[in-house]
Design a protein with these regions (language model features):
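Catalytic active-site module of serine/aspartate enzymes centered on a nucleophile-bearing elbow/loop
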Residues: 224-259
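Conserved alpha/beta-hydrolase
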Residues: 30-53
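Catalytic nucleophile-loop/oxyanion-hole region of alpha/beta-hydrolase
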Residues: 20-22, 49-78
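Active-site glycine-rich loops that stabilize anionic/oxyanionic intermediates
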Residues: 10, 18-21
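Acidic catalytic loop of the alpha/beta-hydrolase fold
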Residues: 205-209, 237
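Short alpha-helix in the alpha/beta-hydrolase fold that links the catalytic acid
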Residues: 210-219
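Short beta-strand/loop motif that positions the catalytic acidic residue
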Residues: 194, 200-202, 206
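Alpha/beta-hydrolase-fold enzymes
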Residues: 89-172
Length: 259
């Protein structure tokens, strides 16, 4: 876990990254928040980046939630309003974290292309076989089916990812089954977000997450203060796209309302 402190902080952003990636891919976004007066707290999820766990493998999705809980506790010690920004699987983790809290003490929440359904189609034979392998060989790793050019149109990011040894390309059978189980759980209606301001921003040309499932979740979520913005033509990683400065301005305009 790392902390980047602003000179005169008005808030603290906890960033929860997605599958395959790690904190090093967020240097630009971290600096944008920090230079705008926000502390940033972020770590690498279990099995990803510099974490010591087996790459691409978890025993339970709860491991992610427990890890993020530590980051949020750290953010609370910085004595500034705490905001969460969950991207992709990080958005799914954020949703499930909220559902487990009685008093989340979060000022506002941003979800970026949250993983609430997969756009990529998994081989049906593999999908069926994974149910048995989840019991017999849960740590067996298979190709994730994702490639850097599916996530963004940013050529610099694509090249960096293709040459990054920390970028996860294989995931375990258990990871896959836990992801699907958690997506199903997230779609169950909840009032966990009733009182927290929520901004959901979705890539309009997402090649990874099913934006129709994202829309369905957003339409069904109970909230007194929620807003949805779809970025036409943008791929999955809206904060890495060529238009990312415009996307960031929209995110900051949202958080600035609550400082």
């Amino acid at each position: 876990m790392w902390t980047w402190k602003a000179d005169r902080p008005v808030g603290t952003i906890v960033i929860i990254h997605g599958a395959s990636e790690y904190h090093g891919r967020y240097k630009w976004l971290v600096e944008m928040w920090r230079s705008s007066g926000y502390n940033v707290v972020m770590g690498d999820l279990p099995g990803q980046g510099t974490s010591t766990r087996a790459r691409g493998h978890i025993r339970s999705f709860q491991e992610y939630i427990d890890e993020v809980d530590i980051w949020i506790d750290k953010a609370r010690t910085l004595e500034a309003p705490v905001f969460l920004l969950g991207h992709s699987m990080g958005g799914l983790i954020t949703i499930e974290w909220f559902k487990q809290q009685r008093n989340p003490r979060i000022t506002a929440l941003i979800l970026s292309s949250p993983c609430l359904g997969l756009q990529i189609k998994v081989n049906k034979v593999l999908d069926f076989a994974s149910k048995g392998l989840n019991v017999l060989a849960p740590s067996l790793r298979v190709d994730s089916g994702l490639s850097p050019d599916m996530a963004t149109r940013n050529a610099d990011m694509i090249e960096a990812d293709q040459n990054d040894s920390l970028y996860v390309t294989k995931v375990s059978v258990r990871w896959y089954r836990e992801l699907l189980k958690t997506i199903d759980a997230a779609m169950v209606p909840t009032d966990a977000f009733l009182k927290v301001p929520l901004l959901l921003m979705q890539g309009g040309d997402d090649k990874i997450v099913d934006k129709m499932k994202v829309r369905k979740w957003f339409s069904g979520v109970a909230s007194h203060n929620k807003s949805y913005r779809e970025w036409e033509g943008l791929y999955h990683e809206i904060f890495n796209e060529p238009e990312r400065e415009t996307v960031f301005k929209a995110a900051k305009a949202f958080t600035d309302q609550y400082i």
